[in-house]
Amino acid sequence: MAALIRNLGARAAVAALSAKHVVPAAGSTALRMASTTPVEPKKADKPTVRQPDAVARSHLSDFGRYVAECLPKYVQKVQLTAGDELEVLIAPEGVVPVLQFLKDHHQAQFTNLVDIAGVDVPCRKNRFEVVYNLLSLRYNSRIRVKTYTDELTPLDSACEVHKAANWYEREIWDMYGVFFANHPDLRRILTDYGFEGHPQRRDFPLSGYVELRYDDEKKRVVCEPLELAQEFRKFDLSAPWEQFPNFRNANPPAEVVPPQAPAKK
């Protein structure tokens, strides 16, 4: 009797071990299907290319809309450029109020004036564009404020809001001839004493009007009218190898932020 029990137990153990190594038909079919299914290639990550963040775009749009609602007298347009860069276009008389609002408002705190740039577009009625680049360290955010003027209309100086605007506005006055009212020390900063004209204007010749040289006889630097060794040539021509032909007479594409937020579905 004991031998019979041992024999039955051995057979049951052998059957259990063999059952573990048997792959059912359904499992083999699934294995074959999984091995033949095409695998989608992974997208290459380019660390040098910054992809726009949808959440950041939404927050910037909401903030630009909020600024336009708070300052409807000065804000003329709000737009997003390069995917997620906020620009606020304002009237010339709104430079100081808008910059003061962006600096002092608790939800903005754009206390750092990074730079002020000038742009000359002669085909416009107001040919000069002045761009204020602001940084908020509190919220790790940037914003651009743009305004416009012409050769005769001055802009209010931003020195009373940002002390860093002093030299930036002097540079724009020197290069473009944009006058800033109430500036504490508006004089040239890059060109030489007695320089005439503004070099960054589009109608200023590349060769200039005068030249400075050291005179061995007079033992000093003299300023004389420019003498060209060849006939003056005009280089303002379109070329087939120009890298950015679309931006010659057009602005970069921008996405306008509507005054009202889109309804949520």
UniProtKB/Swiss-Prot annotation:
Catalysed reactions, as listed in the record: a ubiquinone + NADH + 5 H(+)(in) = a ubiquinol + NAD(+) + 4 H(+)(out)
EC top class, as a word: translocase
PROSITE patterns membership: COMPLEX1_30K
Domain of life: Eukaryota
Keywords tagged on the record: Electron transport, Mitochondrion, NAD, Oxidoreductase, Respiratory chain, Transit peptide, Translocase, Transport, Ubiquinone
InterPro entries in the record: NADH_DH_suC (IPR010218), NADH_quin_OxRdtase_su_C/D-like (IPR037232), NADH_UbQ_OxRdtase_30kDa_su (IPR001268), NADH_UbQ_OxRdtase_CS (IPR020396)
GO terms under cellular component: mitochondrial inner membrane; mitochondrion; respiratory chain complex I
EC number: 7.1.1.2
Entry function: Core subunit of the mitochondrial membrane respiratory chain NADH dehydrogenase (Complex I) that is believed to belong to the minimal assembly required for catalysis. Complex I functions in the transfer of electrons from NADH to the respiratory chain. The immediate electron acceptor for the enzyme is believed to be ubiquinone.
Note: Upon mitochondrial dysfunction, the translation of the mRNA occurring on the mitochondrial surface is impaired and amino acids non-coded by the RNA template are added to the C-terminal of the protein. The C-terminal extended proteins aggregates in the cytosol and are toxic. The phenomenon is called mitochondrial-stress induced translational termination impairment and protein carboxyl terminal extension (MISTERMINATE).
NCBIfam families: NuoC_fam, PRK06074.1-5
Name the UniProt record assigns to this protein: NADH dehydrogenase [ubiquinone] iron-sulfur protein 3, mitochondrial
Originating organism: Drosophila melanogaster
Lineage: Eukaryota, Metazoa, Ecdysozoa, Arthropoda, Hexapoda
Encoding gene, per UniProt annotation: ND-30
